[in-house]
């Protein structure tokens, strides 16, 4: 463990403090707060992350003194910190099973809105680092949870991601789950509204998906009204996919002349120019005096902002305000550099982190600091545009508050920042809400500014009608409210701004403006009339556009009715026509002026960009390929500081960068090395590897596509890469830099036949020691989890076929590395855990001795740490590890007679401990027991200890049996000299070096005297009997029956593999689909041992078969075999234990590849075969191992359902019930679907078992209950229910449950 400390407390010590029941909660709260501060402000040691997570999860369980809330905040900061420090994202991927359920369940906490928002932000950070893991967790947890609040918040979170982060968010993946949630909650309007908004935004960005969404919605059994609500947005998108022609037809005069097209285009240009002129009035232009600062890479960007952060902590003082201003100026320089284009997402993350500091700077009383902070916010909005939206929510409150400042410069700067945000961010309902609130402020400045913000929104709507989406009605209602209040405001400046904004409103929403006019008082209407005349076609608020709107006649009538002079004249119709013509001619000069000014301002930008520009989606007219130059010029018109499309900085970037990119693109497209490496032809790939090797030797610049191509080749044709790693050290290191550490180590493990010190030294020069240990553990995890491996199909097949080769190489590499390099406590624990998983995998292989050697090496490095880790290992595996290193178990009541007494022998760690033999000459006081011969293939009903069997069968005179056991047991040179006796604790023991059977003569007399004294010690037998005993010791087992081999699967697998290979060679069987189907038929027609052996050989030989056969088996063969097995079990006699057990072994092998078996038939087979068996029978242990190895989610849920139904029955068989309870104990500790109804159901089942006379029922129920309480994935409501039902039991029962919770 790393020695990194904070406040003189190491992470392990802090974990002990939080886990202790004796330490006061105040002390725990103080320590967790210190941990949160450490994570938030300091760079953490990533090796301590697992311990930090343990501390935080312990803290989440403590509801007192707000410890749970502080712990969750610490988790949020930890996720952010890891995402910043760990660029590979491996840590978050590894810990997703622990973190994501906490975050997702937090979304359903209605009592803590702040916690919900924090969970959303943490999920966002997590998704940016590990998108697949987050999406899978949401699918499995959020939409399967009965808490609808979680579902609603999840949909809202998706909407936020889609709008602000990525338009490529995979919404279709979640659509079936969302529609299913609506099916089961048809009256929940919140889900429907949230879903409608999500679909609307997604379809706006991906219109091609509309038809697919419609079909999916129609395929679900939803109410027609619900479909209409969801499909309303879809249909609107279908109609709105070509919105501009409708507007054009509505506003175009009788003929489609070129003049009318130009006029329509000028309308669009007018909105654009008017918006630019309005923004220039609030100082929107970017300051050109600040120099740009380029950043080398994303790491440098994060490190730079981390340096900025400390000065913004706490209050502003005389000593830190200048530092703050300096950092703000440097941020403005960074914003102008390459980070806004090359590291955009990282820059947004950094700004999000320092947003609080920006707000502090803007609120400063020092004018320069406040002004520079506001300028920074404005420039962030102009340059980053919609990417800034996640940060904007934290900036708006401070800025709007600053708008009310009595200090005019501060108020003006705040208005400038808010206007820039409104001009560049996508529309949300909160925008109009802020405008409404500001219009009600008692100070006149916020009221005036609110009209400017509303004016900006109206112009953006005029430019792009889809800007506000489906918020039309709420926007218009809020705008009417603002106009009704501010058109009659007491301040004349506010009234004038309101009039200008109103005339913009009439051009965008003419019908709504007309309805509003009828509601206004006469004096306000007259004031509007005067402002219309005074505008004179200039300024920012002209009365009309060139093309007349349908609402304008009604507006004229309203004004004419209130104009006495016009009413008294009553001119003839011809004069009326002339007057009407005059009214229409009033606004004509303005568009002409605007267009001419626009032409003059845009002549220079057009010179540098000769290519035809893309036309805005919001244009009023579609571009025509046959349009004249004049129309084309109008489409091209843009201002120099364009708001809606490009950052002004992009225009000033050096053109040399574009040329470089073009050259790079050209070279990559025509590079023969890239073409060869991406080919599917083996010869071309080899040629590409040779080209790459010579390119590396020649120190050429390699294209970026090489990395992904090499990863693909490493999975499909790894041996082709051998020249890269065997030529010389330089090519080795360069090739290593092109691969990820895990892929690099996997390639080395397969390319090199043996690892030596030179190779390991070279590997560690390429990747540091900690990364080497991490990658080695990752590879061992893949081997242990085969075939459930994440990644491509090629990677899965490679690991499955080469798992023993990879394991051997990695174990060799770890052995060499551990002898040369130090290992931290975290790495020590990770290596130990991976080795424990490999015991079952390697038990019956030749590499088991290598695994044992590595265990002993770890024990030599740190015996205390090793002993602590052994205590956490479960039962049988724990005994195996203790046996390997010679630790005497403290949990066993009697010592297994097959194990040696290490108390009598001093073992040197450097000695060869692989071979232990019995003394050939038993002493006179030895006890000797002769054992009967064991039947082949577990044919008899008795099962003996595997090591006893190995010793007995090693001395058997039968050549056939001797040959079989020689293959199963590890190779020993002294096998023919082994004794048939079983020695007790007083046996003579020797450790053989190279096969010798005599005691080591080099031991001195003192050692012999010490051993002799220990033997004759009269109190030694009594001390050996002092053991920790099980609390359910009253469950006596029949001591006459020998113990079952702890690794039945590995032992049975070894026997089958050896025997099957002999038979296969004899019968000349071939791995073909035809032969496989023939054997399946024979298995059904004539059930026998030979048919089982053949089928087992087919499954066992899958890893060495051809690719075609593997594809056949994984797609069709496994289902054919499953069907044949069910028919096999239905025909055989269940009393034939040998046949049943061998059939179960084949079924267990099949379940590794088939994740969708018939669970009902599986459970029926369990009941059929175990109904007459005892708890210590072979079949019981076989079934128990098979059930505990199930690891597919759907399969586990289905079997859990069957087990609960069985336990709810009236009459329960002890053996079957015990198997069901063991399985439930496994799954309940991590169950993500626990709700109150299921808790009461489980309580009914377990409560009934507490009153059973049979002790095994009571013990199993207690263990299940303790695992249920240890589940950390439950909601607070479920947690309270668990505590409530537990409190109803007697105190003795509660203590037993708490006892097992601590194990």
UniProtKB/Swiss-Prot annotation:
Q: Where in the cell is it found?
A: Cytoplasm, Cytoskeleton; Nucleus; Cytoplasm, Cytoskeleton, Spindle
Question: Can you tell which superkingdom this protein's organism belongs to?
Answer: Eukaryota
Q: Which residues form a coiled coil?
A: none
> What keywords does the record list, in alphabetical order?
Cell cycle, Cell division, Cytoplasm, Cytoskeleton, Microtubule, Mitosis, Nucleus
Broad class of where this protein is predominantly found? cytoplasm
How this chain assembles, per its entry, is: Interacts with microtubules.
Q: Which Gene3D superfamilies match?
A: Leucine-rich Repeat Variant
**Name of the protein in question:** Protein STU1
Region (Disordered), start-end ranges: 239-259, 531-664, 953-977
Summarizing the function annotation, the protein's role is:
Microtubule binding protein that promotes the stabilization of dynamic microtubules. Required for mitotic spindle formation.
Pfam families annotated for this entry? CLASP_N
The family database entries (InterPro entries) matched by this protein are listed as: ARM-like, ARM-type_fold, CLASP_N_dom, TOG
User: Ranges of Basic and acidic residues compositional bias?
Assistant: 554-568, 596-609, 634-648
Family indicated by similarity = Belongs to the CLASP family.
